[in-house]
Regions:
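Short aromatic/hydrophobic "clamp" motif used to bind/position activated sugar donors
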Residues: 76
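Donor-binding/catalytic cores of nucleotide-activated saccharide
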Residues: 84-203, 213
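Basic, ligand-binding patches in group-transfer machinery
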Residues: 247-642, 666
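Short, acidic, metal-binding catalytic loop of nucleotide-sugar glycosyltransferases
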Residues: 20-29
């Protein structure tokens, strides 16, 4: 009998699916021990299931320990209630144990993350192997993918005492097993919320320290290969994650993390370090033995420099030259030598074709990470049979492939010369292709992956009725197989079923910035739409019929509300929908579509579906890390008498820099003015020339302009040149505590380091009032000149009634309708995996219905509100509107929380309401607030939506303010700023 423990507590409705996935296994001789508390939401589900299936035994008062003690089966596994067991899993696993007699079997698993499924494999299949022979099985073993003798689960790591987490118990099973099987069959799927991965450094660093210490102690009596495997595959990655949290944690926990590292890590002379990459070795040594300054330097460099390591060929072999080693002390030389783990051969196959029936022509790229392709030999490609025999061997010809730099993400090396072409006789039977490259008397090998694009086969020409086909196998590797005589040519995969298909055959960008797609369809008699779909929004266009069965559609990429990033390409008709399939001409490497407003990249997935990435209009070289690094290092020439302006790192055409730009142009500035934009959808102030962030003209303007004006930080690499002047306008009077004043852990290490470099480079800081000056200087550690005065951006509030009604007309709001502007600040807790989130603690739909007002929702760019779910015309998403000042003029009342917009809107004299339902959490935990906010503020504070609705009804019933703004303070401050800029341009010392 097989016993399956299912941990249902906290899984909610997912628990039923987990239990049913066990009951539906073809292996019928099993019992389910469902661990669930009587008060848990899943208890009722478990009771109902148990009433209909006697194989289920609820364990109402206990935990996994108690359930294992109750198990009647000789074999056991543990399933989390969030997860599911895949069909046929237990038959495959028990069958393997019957054949081998091993104590445990480990299968492959699949992580169902927000970014899509990710397969977690054992290294390869093994039968009755000892753990020291297969230490790679310690790479994050998943409980539900491990089936073992029940006694192993009962005694796993028992000597350590205390409660045991699921990953700890699972590793204990592997350590206790005499022999193990491993399968490449997927047997288990787990998702966010599951207990199988164990505690995370982000959510519970102390628990992860506990786990690491216990695993380290448990492994102390094991053989060196097992201890090394545990360090490489489990403890090392856990300690790296803890190291990344160290600067954000309270001192007591940070010290605990360092002690944990010291207790686990071996001496520098130990060979156990050899399985880790160089920068991980350096980080962990510094964590255990270095100072805080060096630890922060190493952690910061992993983001600022990347985790790529430049390698050069020296007299004694390869030498690692990561720049961070020049900035820290005390790392033993044994840890900085090049190990096998530091040498990774990367291979990409762009396309395959045939020269006759037997010769396969392969085009792709192959390079060793960190090594200049000029320092290596040409790739050697071998066809290898199932028995390991080499069937053919050819030296490839090198060619250029600029795409390799984009894929590599390496700032220190170019792999543009790593392309190859080779023609290899494939032999008669099944074969795989293997690449090898030599460098410094070392040979590195790897199997060639399947070609880019879908998993369709590429058949050879027929000779005497015999053909062969190149295709991707189940592991994503390139293989060649014989086709039986008369076998039909394999069709492209289709996720849409046999009746409805929309096939993409052409793609391009129009001059106007529209993505023009064309193709053919089958099984669709009526019309249909093409859609770009992502978690952040969708773009829709009707497919226009052309000739019979063909269509064309233009998707507008120029709307500022269309976020950049990846989208799936789908079709939708009145009664059906599905994923678009790529046609043969687009099935392969990514198709680059260059535009002037935005660019796009079309990608074919393995299942034949298509994705589109919407990007800034940059070249492939400008998008690559190497290309950017070369632009950073390039000499851009002497300074130019000109002004470079940027708002929110190029995302905006507004705020203080835009008002300063407009003022300079209106007063006839006789110097070039450059405006930084993320892409061509960002509005550019009149009189300025747009430069796209990351482009060569942008680098040149930023590096050569005499005056730089920004309201945010500049890139991390930026360093002001002699003679340049930098005006920091900032972007609001601070309410949220900033930088050095913020709560511990609220500000990332990378941002702290960036600001520590950039704040001393400011020549003038703007502050809206004296309190803002004090808080900004305190938070930033700034000691330079400060100009106190009304913000330039509030020149946008001088438009009065004319602009008010103009904006209302643009938004479709009647002139006399009451209008509420809801403009909350951002919250870290709302950020999802894609950077988006719900973005609101307010039910805008209910607010509009209960107040009779139109609600304008202005979400922060860090927490985009998902407007497609509002379902009411009275709620309008204005997050993408270019000028918040226009929205303030259009509104009768402002609702906000901890946003500096209150100090701007207050100039209109109209009502403001502070809505802070999460005040304690935000003020005391997440961020911290200045000056007794919001209780000490001049505006009413409400904590619930019902209170808010009552206050707003009263405010809207009162006579409306004219909203006129005194122009003098704004214009006077603009004049002072203009004089400062002109003096700076003319080489005078600004006043």
């Amino acid at each position: 009998m097989l016993s399956v423990v299912v941990l249902c507590d906290g899984a909610g409705p997912l628990a039923e699916g987990a239990v049913r996935s066990v009951l539906n296994q073809s292996c019928r001789d099993l019992e389910v021990l469902a661990v669930v508390s009587a008060e848990d939401d899943a208890a009722e589900v478990v009771a109902l299931l148990a009433a209909h299936d006697r194989r289920i035994r609820p364990v109402a008062e206990g935990d996994v320990e108690d359930a294992i003690g109750l198990a009647r089966g000789r074999l056991l596994t543990v399933v989390d209630g969030h997860d599911s067991v895949l069909a046929g899993a237990y038959e495959a696993m028990t069958g393997a144990l019957r054949r081998s007699g091993a104590d445990a079997v480990v299968g492959a698993s699949r992580c169902l993350s927000a970014l899509g499924p990710r397969r977690c494999d054992p290294p390869q299949e093994h039968r009755a192997a000892r753990l020291e022979e297969v230490p790679g099985l310690l790479r994050g073993p998943i409980a539900g993918a491990v089936l073992a003798r029940t006694r192993l689960w009962a005694t796993a790591l028992d000597a350590t005492g205390g409660p045991r987490s699921l990953p700890e118990r699972t590793i204990g099973v592997l350590l206790g097993a005499g022999t193990l099987d491993s399968l490449d069959t997927e047997v288990y799927a787990w998702r966010s919320g599951s207990s199988v991965p164990g505690p995370s450094a982000r959510n519970d660093a102390a628990a992860l320290c506990d786990l690491a210490e216990r695993l380290g102690a448990a492994a102390s009596g094991e053989t060196e290969p097992v201890r090394s495997g545990l360090l490489t595959h489990r403890l090392g990655p856990d300690l790296v994650r803890l190291a990344e949290r160290c600067p954000l944690e309270a001192p007591v926990l940070a010290d605990r993390i360092r002690r944990t590292a010291r207790s686990i890590l071996p001496s520098a002379e130990s060979s156990m370090w050899s399985g880790m990459r160089l920068l991980d070795r350096v980080l962990l040594w510094v964590l255990a033995h270095g100072g805080q300054e060096d630890l922060e330097e190493v952690l910061g460099s992993r983001v600022e420099d990347s985790t790529c390591v430049p390698l050069v060929v020296g007299e004694g072999g390869l030498i690692a030259q990561p720049p961070v080693l020049d900035r820290i002390r005390g790392v033993p030389a044994q840890l900085t030598g090049v190990q096998d783990a530091d040498l990774v051969l990367r291979c990409v196959v762009d396309s395959v074709g045939w020269s006759g029936r037997e010769v396969l022509v392969v085009r792709g790229a192959a390079y060793i990470e960190g090594v200049d392709p000029a320092d290596t030999g040409a790739p050697v490609i071998e066809a290898v049979g199932p028995d390991g025999k080499v069937l053919a061997r050819r030296v490839a010809s090198r060619c250029r492939t600029p795409q390799a730099d984009l894929d590599a993400g390496d700032p220190w090396r170019s792999y543009a010369e790593s392309g190859f072409t080779v023609a290899v006789p494939a032999g008669e039977g099944t074969s795989r292709l293997r690449a090898s490259i030599a460098v410094a008397n070392r040979d590195l090998t790897c199997w060639l992956p399947a070609p880019a694009g879908s998993a369709r086969s590429v058949p050879s020409p027929s000779e005497d009725g015999e053909r062969r086909a190149a295709r991707g196998d189940a592991h994503g590797l390139l293989e060649v197989v014989p086709l039986l005589s008369g076998a039909a040519e394999p069709e492209a995969p289709s996720g849409n079923g046999p009746h409805h298909r929309v096939i993409l055959t052409g793609a391009g960008l129009t001059k106007g910035g529209r993505l023009r797609l064309s193709g053919r369809s089958t099984g669709l008699d009526g019309g249909f739409d093409l859609l770009l779909v992502s978690s952040r929004g969708r773009v829709r266009a009707a497919a226009v019929p052309e000739t019979a069965g063909t269509w064309r559609a233009d998707l507008d990429l120029t709307e500022p509300t269309t976020a950049r990033g990846a989208y799936s390409l789908r079709w939708e008709s009145a009664d059906a929908s599905g994923a678009c399939t790529v046609g043969e001409d687009l099935d392969g490497p990514a198709t680059e579509l260059s535009g002037s407003v935005r660019s796009a990249r079309l990608i074919a997935h393995r299942d034949g579906s298509a994705a589109v990435t919407v990007m800034a209009p940059l070249s492939v070289t400008e998008r690559s890390r190497r290309g950017r690094q070369l632009l950073v290092e390039q000499d851009m020439g002497p300074l130019v008498r000109g002004v470079f302006l940027e708002s929110f790192r190029g995302r905006s055409g507004g705020d203080n820099p835009a008002a300063i730009c407009a003022d300079l142009v209106s007063h006839g500035l006789d110097a070039p003015v450059w405006w930084s934009v993320e892409d061509g959808t960002v509005p550019v102030p009149s009189g300025a020339d747009a430069v796209v962030v990351g482009s060569e003209p942008w680098f040149r303007a930023l590096r050569t302009a005499h005056v730089i004006v920004t309201n945010d930080n500049l890139p991390s690499w930026f360093s002001k040149r002699e003679g340049q002047r930098l005006l920091q306008t900032w972007h609001g009077t601070p309410i949220k505590r900033l930088l050095n004043d913020a709560a511990p852990g609220a500000v990332s290490l990378v941002y702290r380091r960036l600001m520590a470099r950039q704040v001393p480079q400011w020549d003038l800081l703007l502050a809206q009032n004296e309190e803002a000056r004090r808080n900004l200087c305190s938070a930033m550690g700034y000691t330079g000149d400060v100009l106190v005065g009304e913000y330039p951006r509030n020149a946008g509030l001088l438009g009065g009634t004319r602009v008010r009604y103009q904006v209302r007309a643009e938004l479709g709001v009647p002139e006399e309708s009451p209008v509420l502007l809801y403009a909350p600040t951002w919250r870290e807790s709302f950020r999802g995996a894609d950077g988006a989130g719900p973005g609101s603690l307010l039910d805008a739909k209910a607010l509009a219905q209960r107040t009779g007002a139109v609600v304008l929702v202005r979400s922060h760019h860090m927490n985009r509100w998902r407007a497609e779910h509002n379902g009411i015309a009275q709620v309008i998403d204005v997050s993408g509107h270019p000028r918040v000042e226009d929205l303030m003029l259009a509104a009768d009342v402002l609702v906000t929380d901890y946003s500096s917009i209150v100090f701007d809107f207050d100039l209109t004299g109209r009502p403001i309401v502070i809505y802070a339902p999460d005040l304690e959490s935000y003020r005391d935990v997440e961020r911290g607030l200045y000056g007794g906010w919001p209780e000490a503020a001049a505006w009413p504070l409400v904590r619930t939506q019902s209170e808010l609705e009552a206050v707003l009804r009263r405010a809207l019933a009162s006579p409306r303010s004219a909203g006129s703004v005194d122009p003098a303070p704004v214009k006077e401050n603009l004049a002072r700023i203009r004089r400062w800029i002109l003096d700076s341009l003319d080489g005078k010392e600004p006043i």
